[in-house]
Amino acid sequence: NSSIIESAITSGTNVILKAQRNIYVQSDIIATGSSGGDLTLNAGVDINISANITTANGNLTLEANNESISGRGNNRYSDIDISSTVNLGTGDLNITLGNSNTTGSYDVNLSSATINANDITITDSATDNSQPSDLGNFTASSAINITSNNKYLNVNGASLTANGAGTAVNITSKYLSGSGSVSTPNGIWRATNTDTSSNGGNFGGFTGNFIQYGYSSGDAIQGTGSGLLSAYDPGNLFKNYQV
């Protein structure tokens, strides 16, 4: 019952919902005030949020495809989908999609989501590269950190804004697909592609101050400011000029 959850969060009480398989949020959860409790959704398989969530500055944690939950079954479709508005104020958003031998749809789909939070952290550990995760409209008062080491990310139509200092947006994936935008008015952003094939040269429409090819984790970064780092090494580049 969403009203019970609303009342608990409004009073500052932390709420944890745990399911062997799926969690669906189909009614708005709108906490009021400014000292809301934290909300955690922990599912053995899926989390699907189609209603709006406001936590009154509480944190929101979403964990799906959690193999530590007994009774989840095998070969389940595992996703985290948000198609609504999530407003956490000064609260943090943490999204984690675990990895297993699950077959089928296997991604974090936020393409229709509008998310406002302090920090936004997304970790997609799934391995089915045919099911890339999709980013949406994110605004963070501090930082956005996204990791999808095993798959590429779809940023088509995505808008990422982080207002913190330093590296306010940090993305690591095989590569970026589509055409999105990124803004860090008080800091910089970095996107790291780990794919060593030519796909590693795809940066989803993001343009920075520099591109560094042949990059491996731990290498010295040659450029300054916002930039693109790629494991892809195109070899020697040259251009013939006719005079």
Residue locations for each model-derived region?
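Glycine-centered small-residue motifs that form tight turns
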Residues: 12-15, 36-43, 57-64, 69-80, ...
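Acidic Asp/Glu-based divalent-cation binding sites
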Residues: 21-22, 46, 67
